[in-house]
Structures are given as C-alpha cells and as structure tokens.
From Swiss-Prot:
Recorded superkingdom: Viruses
Transmembrane segment boundaries: 276-294
Task of the protein: Binds to chondroitin sulfate on the cell surface to provide virion attachment to target cell.
Organism: Vaccinia virus (strain Tian Tan) (VACV)
InterPro entries tied to this protein: CA_dom (IPR001148), CA_dom_sf (IPR036398), Carbonic_anhydrase_a-class (IPR023561)
Protein name: Cell surface-binding protein OPG105
Biological processes per GO annotation: symbiont entry into host cell; virion attachment to host cell
Any one Gene Ontology cellular component term annotated for this protein: membrane
Gene3D superfamilies associated with the record: Alpha carbonic anhydrase
Subunit and interaction comment: Homodimer; disulfide-linked.
GO MF, one annotated term: carbonate dehydratase activity
Family annotation (PROSITE patterns): ALPHA_CA_2
Amino acid sequence: MPQQLSPINIETKKAISNARLKPLDIHYNESKPTTIQNTGKLVRINFKGGYISGGFLPNEYVLSSLHIYWGKEDDYGSNHLIDVYKYSGEINLVHWNKKKYSSYEEAKKHDDGLIIISIFLQVSDHKNVYFQKIVNQLDSIRSANTSAPFDSVFYLDNLLPSKLDYFTYLGTTINHSADAVWIIFPTPINIHSDQLSKFRTLLSSSNHEGKPHYITENYRNPYKLNDDTQVYYSGEIIRAATTPPARENYFMRWLSDLRETCFSYYQKYIEENKTFAIIAIVFVFILTAILFFMSRRYSREKQN
C-alpha cells in the first residue's frame, strides 16, 4: 500500500478510540532553545534537552526542534484539520528515538525514529505572553536563511494546551522526507492576531522578479487518507472537544492574562530578584483564587 502522506484531515467519527493509549509523559522542564532560524520557508527553533515518554511510546524520544506554520489570513494556517475545521496556525515539535538510534539523521530513516507533536494555534482577542517570547525573536531572523541565538528565558511547557488527549497516526514529515508518527492535540492554544501577523513579515528564500518575497503562508493542504490508514484517539470521542473555543468573559480573560504575566515575571526573576519574584507569585495565587470563584459563579449563572 502507498505511504500515508501528511498532513491529513482527521475525521473524529472515523477515529478509533483506544483506552490503551495512556497519557504522555512530557518532560520539557529541562529543554532550552538554542537558536531560532528563518529557513526561508518556516520558523524553526532548535532545542537542547527535553523528551517525551509514556503513552504508547516504547521509550524516550528526545526533543529536536519546533516548527511554526501559518496562513495569509487568521482563519486558516494549520497543516492538519479536525473535521475540516481550520485553525489559525500550527506548531510541530519534532522528537527522535535516541535510545534506538545514534542520531536524528539515522532515526529519520526508520518508521519508529520520529515522533511529531502538533499543537494548534487559534487567534483570539488576547495575547499569549508565552508565545510572545517567540514573536520577540523574529526581528533577528527577518531575512531568509538566517539564524540567531534564542536569547530569552523560554519554558516550552507553557505552550502546551490545557487538555492533552490526542489523536495519533503514522504519516510522514511535512516535507515527506521521512516517516513520522504524529501526535495531535485537538485542543488549541490561543494567540492574538498581531502575534501571528508578525510571521508574515519574514522574508522567503524565493524571489519574485528579483523582489523580496514574504512568507505570507507556509501551511500544507491535507492529503487524502489511504484506505489502510488508521487514526487513533487516546480517549472517548467527544465532538465538542474539537470545536473552536468559545469567547470568554472579558474581565476573566484579562485576569487570566495578568496571572500569566505575573507567573512569567516570577520565572524570569526568581534567580535575579527574589523579592520581586515572591511578589509576583503572590499575585499569581491571588488571581488564581479570584478566577476560581468567578468561574464557579459564572457556571451557576449559566445553569440558572
């Protein structure tokens, strides 16, 4: 049978719910970004440290790099689709089987060598303070085929979605150079339109009539599913899990952003200025409590 090319549209009604697909163990706490690149086609961040295990994985897969995809408009920029729903963008986290193979180049020659985690980006009304750390680096790689040190404290865990149930299937890398097992989180993370538009100002490696060309879009259209391709889901299929996030109460959203900002300050200054860091984490706890009671009140109001 022909190889299943990626990306694909995942039809939830055809996905096979498999309770044996246990939660993943994600160990990104020790991952550190080393460099950020404009490859002329996408943004790539190289990492040192970090790995995933558990779930259906036979052993640890080491994090290698992060790739970002987007479109001309905010309503379509993801490679993969869920029930034909198009997300604003997509992050791909590439891992390789270090226990079994000696290098990434060796691992990608085998169908159990690569694991790619997909995280969807959904444009909303507020900025993502963690994603902003990537956006802040883009000016240093505006030209095609350039790279720069990633000179900001960055915790990849903060870009994980709130729910980690996942779809999985055997496909290929986006450029079809190797087989890859895909792990796709249907729950997106929210970013602001201004953050995504910054990626469209990067220069492409291709020129048009001698003039600079921008990477206005770089997503790939989905391929038809082969007859023998199976898509599995790590839990009970719930259609609502794949629908776009509803708009939240504005004030609660603002409080949530403020809490994330305070937590970001805590992480940044814990070594440099402990007093400031302690004040920041106190605000995090206070805002968390406020959000908790407001969400309970909001839930009761909806029920009534």
